[in-house]
């Protein structure tokens, strides 16, 4: 008949199997649990030794090969030390020996690599991406800045090219009724005297008459300046 004892959570488990061999307790996941406190004889002051069948390792786990897959052999404390697979102690905050390359070390993702990434002071550094790597967001932001700077000074001409962007004042003039005709008439009035230079006073008088006719046409087109 196997001997039963009560565990940490009150569940009975056998300390010795049917052959008399000690059996270490396990939790619900099958991992060995820490040994329970030894019974204390308060009357005689005697403390019973712990069960030799259970040996606690790091984090109170039994055995040296029982760490959780996601648990680290590097403790989070400033002075907490761990033992490398080669038997040499090393610390998280520097001052110790880094485990040799190729040795298996238990660490959280991005904290310690298999080769043991260290800084200039011997501290274990988290593994990061390559410094020259640019993300997609940075590329889009850079392309957006370049396109916005180019679009601010030029615009598409509708024929696959770029042309200088017009100012707001020029756009307003284009939208006003009769503005194109007035500009064409002004240009015609300025070029008429230039074409008749050196031909005498008759051409100059004809240019004035032509300019006067243009002004009258403009007045006729303006509202309120029709027939008097």
UniProtKB/Swiss-Prot annotation:
Pfam families: Dehydrin. InterPro entries: Dehydrin, Dehydrin_CS. GO terms for biological process: cold acclimation; response to abscisic acid; response to water deprivation. This is Dehydrin Rab25. PANTHER family: DEHYDRIN XERO 1, DEHYDRIN XERO 2-RELATED. Residues 169-187, 212-228 have a biased composition (Basic and acidic residues). Residues 1-68, 115-228 are annotated as: Disordered. It comes from the Eukaryota. Belongs to the plant dehydrin family. Disulfide bonds: none annotated.
């Amino acid at each position: 008949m196997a001997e039963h004892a009560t565990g940490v959570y009150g569940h009975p488990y056998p300390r010795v199997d049917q052959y008399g061999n000690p059996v270490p307790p396990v939790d619900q996941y099958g991992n060995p649990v820490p040994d329970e406190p030894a019974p204390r004889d308060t009357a005689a002051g005697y403390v019973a030794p712990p069960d030799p069948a259970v040996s606690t390792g790091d984090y109170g786990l039994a055995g040296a090969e029982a760490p959780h897959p996601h648990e680290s052999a590097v403790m989070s404390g400033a002075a907490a030390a761990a033992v490398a697979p080669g038997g040499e102690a090393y610390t998280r905050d520097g001052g110790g020996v880094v485990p040799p390359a190729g040795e298996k070390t238990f660490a959280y993702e991005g904290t310690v690599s298999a080769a043991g990434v260290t800084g200039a002071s011997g501290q274990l550094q988290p593994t990061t991406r390559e410094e020259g790597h640019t993300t997609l967001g940075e590329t889009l932001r850079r392309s957006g800045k370049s396109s916005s700077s180019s679009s601010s000074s030029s615009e598409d001409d509708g024929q696959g090219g770029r042309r200088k962007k017009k100012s707001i004042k020029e756009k307003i003039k284009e939208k006003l009724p009769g503005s194109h005709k007035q500009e064409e008439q002004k240009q015609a009035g300025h070029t008429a005297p230039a074409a008749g230079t050196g031909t005498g006073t008759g051409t100059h008088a004809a240019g004035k008459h032509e300019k006067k006719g243009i002004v009258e046409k403009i007045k006729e087109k303006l509202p309120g300046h029709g027939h008097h």
